[in-house]
């Protein structure tokens, strides 16, 4: 053994002794090289994300204009985690969560941890405590724009507080990012959009909270309404585009189109018809949709209703779509497979 190798081995032993086993290793020795994910609640979004859902142990930013469906997207993720037996938390800085709507999306509100903090510092400290516990699979913060620093709340209405929120987010994310990775918690930050003053060329839109969240996020999703979905003169929902503007775990810039129906959330039937037609799993002839020898209905809304009533056919089409995109047919196991080890790593 060379002197260099002996010196390296000694340094590695010293690091492990000081910081604990697993604090340094060769990349190929990592026990889990494949990215563990949780389904997003939308098949189209799972495909657009490229890995079959939201990656565990990462920060996700979901932003867009008002009433575009950002909270709906986050609530679907919570419902998926709960269905797999995981623990979810919702930090409602906007004080606007509708429990009835959440329940309709499949969220178990009896088990959902909810916090409605008074200040931005309080919200982020609660998020950090939940992440460091190693027992929470997903934490949603709604929204970054509503994380008001304590100094601003205690000050007068006309006081200037330049850069306070950006500094708060930067400090919080520096502390949170390592703990999120070790505990394999998914942290979803919902954000609004603002317009920069005096921008003549390029996109004037930006997100509040400074640049830190843009850097620390592994995935950034832009949610925008594309068009209204009508039945006669009644508006039933919106066709919504979700663009993956940043992705560190798969190629970015893919787009998912989903129907967000009022009072129902993302329409699984709608996206299965759209994806199925795109992949030629579902055949479209004129206005008629059919699958193999089975006619699904005339017009998209009738085909959606048919799939809603015939779950067996819906599942068969869904299975073929998942197979095409290479998505797991089953969900990922809850994050804490070895809670003791995760807790030990968090406390070193």
UniProtKB/Swiss-Prot annotation:
It comes from Bacillus licheniformis (strain ATCC 14580 / DSM 13 / JCM 2505 / CCUG 7422 / NBRC 12200 / NCIMB 9375 / NCTC 10341 / NRRL NRS-1264 / Gibson 46). It is found in: Cytoplasm. Belongs to the RecA family. InterPro entries: AAA+_ATPase (IPR003593), DNA_recomb/repair_RecA (IPR013765), DNA_recomb/repair_RecA_CS (IPR020584), P-loop_NTPase (IPR027417), RecA-like_C (IPR049261), RecA-like_N (IPR049428), RecA_ATP-bd (IPR020588), RecA_C_sf (IPR023400). Can catalyze the hydrolysis of ATP in the presence of single-stranded DNA, the ATP-dependent uptake of single-stranded DNA by duplex DNA, and the ATP-dependent hybridization of homologous single-stranded DNAs. It interacts with LexA causing its activation and leading to its autocatalytic cleavage. SUPFAM superfamilies: P-loop containing nucleoside triphosphate hydrolases (SSF52540), RecA protein, C-terminal domain (SSF54752). This is Protein RecA. Keywords: ATP-binding, Cytoplasm, DNA damage, DNA recombination, DNA repair, DNA-binding, Nucleotide-binding, SOS response. Signal peptide: none annotated. Residues 328-348 are annotated as: Disordered. One of its GO terms (cellular component) is cytosol. ATP binds at residues 64-71. Residues 336-348 have a biased composition (Acidic residues). Its main location: cytoplasm. One of its GO terms (molecular function) is ATP-dependent DNA damage sensor activity. It holds the Pfam family RecA. One of its GO terms (biological process) is DNA recombination. CDD domains: RecA (cd00983). The keyword DNA-binding applies. PROSITE patterns: RECA_1 (PS00321), RECA_2 (PS50162), RECA_3 (PS50163). The keyword DNA-binding applies.
